[in-house]
From Swiss-Prot:
Known glycosylation sites: N42
Biological process per Gene Ontology, one example term: sterol transport
Signal peptide feature range: 1-21
Role summary: Catalyzes the intermembrane transfer of phosphatidylglycerol and phosphatidylinositol.
Organism the protein comes from: Dictyostelium discoideum (Social amoeba)
Name of the protein this chain belongs to: Putative phosphatidylglycerol/phosphatidylinositol transfer protein DDB_G0282107
Keywords for this protein: Glycoprotein, Lipid transport, Signal, Transport
Subunit annotation: Monomer.
Highest taxon, organism lineage: Eukaryota
InterPro entries the UniProt entry points to: GM2-AP_sf (IPR036846), Ig_E-set (IPR014756), ML_dom (IPR003172), NPC2-like (IPR039670)
Family the UniProt entry places it in: Belongs to the NPC2 family.
GO function terms (MF aspect): sterol binding
Amino acid sequence: MKQKLLLFIFSILILLIAAEAKMFKDIWKSCGKSTDTFQIKNVTISPDPPVRGQTVSIYASGELKDTISGGDVNIQIKFGIITIIRETKPICSSDNPFPCPIQPGDYTHSVDIAIPDNAPRGKYSGNFVLTDQANDEIACINVNMQL
């Protein structure tokens, strides 16, 4: 009887570990629409996993269907349910590697976020919404990572 109980507990632990590993295997999900101007193909983070006291770079690659002459990237980072970063950055700025207007084609773009030395360990989530010059959504990405 004791062996069956231990086997049951061991099986549950294996399932929980597998579920946790699967949950963080895919760090991103598109929250956009199929009609979005920028169709996201892939998102990666570097370093993976992120390290406290360093900058994490989040790279998104995809295909831009229409010309963009302006707009913003709205960034929201949460620790659990607590919002810790909320900022808006212009798509057309001096530090953007793609001068505006941005022509249709395949692109990779990154956002760098400094992680403080004292950032608590745990699950972080990010939401990145890109809008064009008319404030219409052109892409949306949700990112999950463990620190």
